[in-house]
Amino acid sequence: MTIKGGVVSQDFSAAFSTVACEPAGVVWNKVCTVLKRELGDAAFGSWIAPAVLREGPSGDVVVVTPTGIARDWIRRSAWRRVSELWTANDATGRRLDLKSRLEFESVGGAGYEAKAEPIEIVLPVSSDVPALAPTNGSKPSPVQGLQERFTFDTFVPGPANEFAHAVARRVASWADGHFNPVLFHGPYGFGKTHLLNALAWEAMRQAPTKRVVYLTAERFLSTFVRAVMDRQTAAFKEELRGADLLIIDDVHFIAGKQSSQEELFHTLTALVEDGRRVVFSSDRAPAAMTEMDARLRSHLSAGLVCGLEPADRALRIGILERKLQALSRQHGFEPTLRAEVLNFLADRFTDSVRELEGALNTLSARAGEGVSRLTLEEVQAILRPHLRAGEKRITIDDIQKATSEHYGMKQVDLLSERRNRAIARPRQAAMWLAKQLTTRSLPDIGRRFGGRDHTTVLHAVRRIEALRADDPVLSQDLETITRKLRG
């Protein structure tokens, strides 16, 4: 019989087969109904609902909390009332005890948890404590802080992230010979959180009995501060250091927080020395975290540091196509975009995968099933209000200067009548960039390139569009110039 995530499941037929009485799950259900009413949804959901009812080593019934902090709160604030309600509802007088998960396992608590159809008590569950993987092998609940959509199946690997992806896969498989700790770093929106979530899900799937703790650095800070205020730091340490795999997202947030850095340093040291796995993410490499404690920074550098690079164009298109498939499953529309729309999104949103996916979400929300019929002009109109705030306005003159500098030529050459390839190809690239990065019409672009007509510009745009798919050098040139222009 189990209570997990606010749902009670009961079947004590094996543990209490000789006792003609109400199943323990039914009794606990009655207790929880009263406690929820008396404590309120927030307190009940935070402290009581995450508990698990287990059979103790001597046949008693034990309320097992996921953390020592939760155990101490229940003992201090609610245990007297819990005991009263249990006694009043259990006619056979079964003894009820309270232990944290580590306590229960250390005294040889039964690993048996009987299962049956659940008696539902749907309650809000707090995520203020570190999230532990369930010991019964069931899929963890989203309230643990993990997002179900972030898995290896939905992660799109490419040159920018394939090494980090391979490392995450290896850690999740519990393979021997891993580096420890592992730190993934890269700017906001590069896929770090997705990778860490995927790693956690896969690690729990591969080894259901292992203990996995996933939390953000902000959660680490807030939980540690609360533990200090409640004088529960020992319980806090107990929970983190009992993990087989500890994952902390955005560890750079801890920099400058002296006591929290100290605690993380000792936790990291203890876990690594004990052969447990530790994984972090941050927005920069350890060497660049100058405000972080030197000892902690050194430990973060001591394992394997994996950088995630900006997604290249092919990877961005792959991400868009995978996202389209997900949207089609959710909403039932045809998972396609016009080629010019797909290319526009991949070329326009180059700095962050989140921005890229956000643009597609916006189109889906606005157009619904009609998203596959949107023209480039309609897409540009829809996304115009959603472009990055304060983005630098790029002019055709900016494009001409950046292109000529990149190719080592004079800007005046782009405006000349010269047609040799060394000049014609950069000129076509600059025209293509002008079409992508400005709102100027084709005739206007032509006028600013030495008075050419719009058909010349259209030919240049189509030529570059066709070439860059098969010419990685040209594709990289366009990306480099674009990044320089956007600064």
Swiss-Prot record:
Where is this protein primarily located? cytoplasm
The entry's ATP-binding residues are G189, G191, K192, T193
User: Where does this protein reside within or beyond the cell?
Assistant: Cytoplasm
* Molecular function terms, GO-annotated: ATP binding; ATP hydrolysis activity; DNA replication origin binding; lipid binding
Q: Which region ranges are annotated with the description Domain IV, binds dsDNA? A: 368-487
Source domain of life is: Bacteria
Q: Where is this region: Domain III, AAA+ region?
A: 145-367
- Show the Gene3D superfamilies listed in the entry: 1.10.1750.10, 1.10.8.60, 3.30.300.180, P-loop containing nucleotide triphosphate hydrolases
Cellular component per GO, a single term: cytoplasm
- SUPFAM superfamilies according to UniProt: P-loop containing nucleoside triphosphate hydrolases, TrpR-like
Annotated coiled-coil positions are none
Q: Which GO terms describe its biological process?
A: DNA replication initiation; regulation of DNA replication
Could you tell me which residues belong to the region Domain II? 92-144
Sorted keywords for this record are: ATP-binding, Cytoplasm, DNA replication, DNA-binding, Lipid-binding, Nucleotide-binding
Q: Which NCBIfam families match?
A: DnaA
Task: Tell me, in a sentence or two, what this protein's role is.
Answer: Plays an essential role in the initiation and regulation of chromosomal replication. ATP-DnaA binds to the origin of replication (oriC) to initiate formation of the DNA replication initiation complex once per cell cycle. Binds the DnaA box (a 9 base pair repeat at the origin) and separates the double-stranded (ds)DNA. Forms a right-handed helical filament on oriC DNA; dsDNA binds to the exterior of the filament while single-stranded (ss)DNA is stabiized in the filament's interior.
- How are the domains described in the entry? Domain I is involved in oligomerization and binding regulators, domain II is flexibile and of varying length in different bacteria, domain III forms the AAA+ region, while domain IV binds dsDNA.
Quaternary structure, from the entry = Oligomerizes as a right-handed, spiral filament on DNA at oriC.
Q: Which family does it belong to?
A: Belongs to the DnaA family.
- Supply the name of the protein: Chromosomal replication initiator protein DnaA
| Species in which this protein is naturally found | Caulobacter sp. (strain K31)
Q: Which gene encodes it?
A: dnaA
